[in-house]
């Protein structure tokens, strides 16, 4: 039996891997992938680079995508945003999302969805230096989009995000006191959402998570 050249074998294996790997982020980060089983999802997204419990991290077209598996099926999808990695949220919630092809901001999503985001944060006061905390806008969709939820996130590293968080924090400290803010009571109280909404309006989102029963920071 004639042996195949090593270069040919390598080409066949590379071709098989290419077929298994998604060609675009759009093939992985879309509403049709929610609810699919893990085996099918990985046939499109490829093999995860890292796994932590139910969370599996993939690299597609240079973009970081995290899929959370619940009982073997995809329950949430998270995309880290960069100038090269942009989310088309219309593939999840239709016209409730801003049109693709433009930077995603909290204000753009508020306008497209008709509002109703609740605002949360990992920490706003006494956070320390062990990590960079994020601020979040959480949206719960109507029946028309099967109650889909969207979680917008902005890490507090860019000046705009830091300044917006400062405005939000300072107003709450002025009204409720610093202990109230340090205890993150704002995560369970919607009184200051209008302040956060105005402050974060033009802040660009750094990651977006879509699914149902999303986890948000508590108090």
Where are these regions (language model features)?
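Bacterial N-terminal signal peptides that target proteins for export
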Residues: 1-9
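Generic anion/oxyanion-binding catalytic loop in active/binding sites
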Residues: 9-11, 30
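N-terminal signal peptide c-region/cleavage motif recognized by signal peptidases
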Residues: 15-17
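Short N-terminal edge-element motif at the start of the domain
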Residues: 23-98
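Non-cytosolic coordination micro-motifs
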Residues: 44, 50, 80-219
């Amino acid at each position: 039996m004639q042996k195949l050249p090593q270069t040919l074998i390598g080409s066949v294996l590379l071709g098989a891997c290419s077929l298994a790997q998604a060609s675009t982020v759009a093939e992985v980060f879309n509403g049709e992938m929610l609810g699919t089983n893990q085996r099918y999802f990985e046939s499109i997204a490829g093999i995860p680079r890292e796994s932590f419990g139910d969370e599996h991290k993939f690299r597609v077209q240079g973009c970081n995508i995290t899929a959370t598996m619940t009982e073997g099926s995809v329950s949430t999808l998270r995309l880290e945003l960069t100038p090269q990695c942009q989310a088309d949220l219309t593939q999840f919630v239709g016209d409730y999302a801003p049109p693709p092809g433009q930077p995603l901001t909290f204000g753009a999503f508020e306008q497209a969805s008709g509002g109703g985001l609740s605002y949360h944060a990992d920490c706003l006061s006494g956070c320390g230096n062990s990590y960079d905390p994020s601020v979040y806008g959480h949206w719960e969709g109507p029946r028309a989009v099967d109650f889909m939820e969207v979680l917008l996130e902005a890490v507090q590293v860019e000046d705009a995000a830091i300044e917006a968080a400062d405005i939000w924090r300072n107003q709450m400290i002025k009204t409720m006191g610093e202990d109230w803010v340090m205890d993150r009571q704002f995560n369970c109280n919607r009184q200051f959402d209008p302040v956060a909404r105005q402050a974060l309006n033009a802040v660009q989102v750094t990651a977006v998570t879509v699914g149902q029963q999303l986890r948000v920071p508590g108090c």
